[in-house]
Amino acid sequence: MGAAAKLAFAVFLISCSSGAILGRSETQECIFYNANWERDRTNRTGVESCYGDKDKRRHCFATWKNISGSIEIVKQGCWLDDINCYDRTDCIEKKDSPEVYFCCCEGNMCNERFSYFPEMEVTQPTSNPVTPKPPYYNILLYSLVPLMLIAGIVICAFWVYRHHKMAYPPVLVPTQDPGPPPPSPLLGLKPLQLLEVKARGRFGCVWKAQLLNEYVAVKIFPIQDKQSWQNEYEVYSLPGMKHENILQFIGAEKRGTSVDVDLWLITAFHEKGSLSDFLKANVVSWNELCHIAETMARGLAYLHEDIPGLKDGHKPAISHRDIKSKNVLLKNNLTACIADFGLALKFEAGKSAGDTHGQVGTRRYMAPEVLEGAINFQRDAFLRIDMYAMGLVLWELASRCTAADGPVDEYMLPFEEEIGQHPSLEDMQEVVVHKKKRPVLRDYWQKHAGMAMLCETIEECWDHDAEARLSAGCVGERITQMQRLTNIITTEDIVTVVTMVTNVDFPPKESSL
C-alpha cells in the first residue's frame, strides 16, 4: 500500500506541475475583422497589434454565425487575458450555439482559421459478466480512491483560485468614496436609461443617461477597445482621484452577451460639454477666461502630483497624454475638470509605467519631441508633454476672449489656420518641428495687461525646449496673479499699467515636475 500511495502522489505532482513546465506562445498580432465596421467607425479587415499589461496574457478570438451551412464572420481581433483561452494553439469552438460561435487561442494570427468540433458524448459500455478480481486488486482500489479524491479536490481548488485571480471580472463597481465606507450598490441593480448621444470619439461614444433621478454620462467602448476602458477604470480607481477639477467617476460595467459585449464607464454629466464645444458657440470675458484657465491648470497640477500618505493610499503622479479642449469639460459655473484617461500613464514607485508607446494622442496637440519620436521615457518628460498641449488650449481660450481692444476671432483649433482641419503627421512635423511655428498671438492682445501676461505664459508652456516649460502648478499661480492684478487696474491707471506689466514678479519659472 505504501508503494501505491507513492505512485499516486507522484502522478498528482506531475499533473499539477505540467502546466508550469510547458511554455506558451506569445500573441503579438491577430487577424482583425468587424462586420459592423461602419457603425463602430473602424477598419473592416486587417491585422491588429495586441497590447496589454506585461503580466497579462494576450489572445486572438473569432466569432461567426452558421446560417444554413454558410459561415458568416462577425468579429476577429485581440482578446485580453481569458483563462479559457490559455494554451490553445488552435481556435476551436466545442459548444453548440444557436446564434453565434466563439473561439479563442494563443499565438500570432492563430484566429486566421477557426472551426467547430462538438464534444463527443461518452456512451456507457454495455455490462459484461463480472469476472472475479484477485484480492490485491481490492486493496489497491481502496488505497488509491481516497488519494485520488484528495488530489481532485486540490486541483479543483487551485483552478478556482487561478480563475478568480486572473480572469477579468464581469462587472467592476467602485466605491462612491474610496475611503473606509462600504461600497455602493451594484450599478446593475439601478435603472440606467440611455437618452441621447452627446459625442463620438476615437474610443467610442458618450451618452447622456438617467440614473435614478440624476443625469449621468455613459461612455460606451466596443470590446476591441477594452484596454482603453480598463486603463480609464484603473486611473479613476487610484487613491485620491476625487478632486473638483477631475471628472467625477461613478462606476464601470460590462453590458451584453459574452460575444457582443459593450464596456460602459459612468461619470458625472455636465450640460455645457467640452471647452471646445463651448468656445465654438460663445466668447469669454477676461474673468471667465481666468476662471476656466485656473481651474484647468489646478486639475492638471493635481493629476501630475505625487501625493503619499492619503487615507486611502498613495496617489501616484499621472500623465494624461491627450490634453486638448475636447477633454476639458465645463461645469455650470464654468469650472473646468479634466476628463478621458484612456491613454494616461501612472508612475508608481518601483513599478513600470506599462507599455509607453511614444506617438499617442491627438496630432495637432503633439509636442515637438513626440512628433520627432525623440521622447525621454521618464516621468518628467511625459508631464512636460502635457504642458505643451495645455499651452495650445490656453491659446484657444485667448482667441475667444473679449478683453483686448480688437476683433474676436472665429473659433479655430490650434494650427487650423496654418494647416487646416485634418493635418497629417508629416504636416505637423513640418510646421512644429522643422519650422518651429506656433499659433498666432495677435498684436492687439498685448495691449491688454492681463492678455499680455497670458501670452507670455502660453509661450513658456509650448517652448520647443521641453525642460524650459512651466509646470501646471506654476501656470495656476500665474493666472491667479494675472486676475488679481487686472482687477485692481482701472481705466485711469492705463499709463501705470505699462510699468506694472514690465515690473511684475511672476512665480518662478522652474518646473516642479
Swiss-Prot record:
Residues 20-135 are extracellular. Pfam families: Activin_recp, Pkinase. One of its GO terms (biological process) is pattern specification process. Keywords: ATP-binding, Cell membrane, Disulfide bond, Glycoprotein, Kinase, Magnesium, Manganese, Membrane, Metal-binding, Nucleotide-binding, Receptor, Serine/threonine-protein kinase, Signal, Transferase, Transmembrane, Transmembrane helix. Its main location: membrane. Residues 162-513 are cytoplasmic. Glycans are attached at N43, N66. The keyword Cell membrane applies. It is found in: Cell membrane. It is a single-pass type I membrane protein. Its cofactor is Mg(2+); Mn(2+). Disulfide bonds join C30-C60, C50-C78, C85-C104, C91-C103, C105-C110. PANTHER family: ACTIVIN RECEPTOR TYPE-2A, TRANSFORMING GROWTH FACTOR-BETA RECEPTOR TYPE I AND II. On ligand binding, forms a receptor complex consisting of two type II and two type I transmembrane serine/threonine kinases. Type II receptors phosphorylate and activate type I receptors which autophosphorylate, then bind and activate SMAD transcriptional regulators. Receptor for activin A, activin B and inhibin A. Mediates induction of adipogenesis by GDF6. This is Activin receptor type-2A.
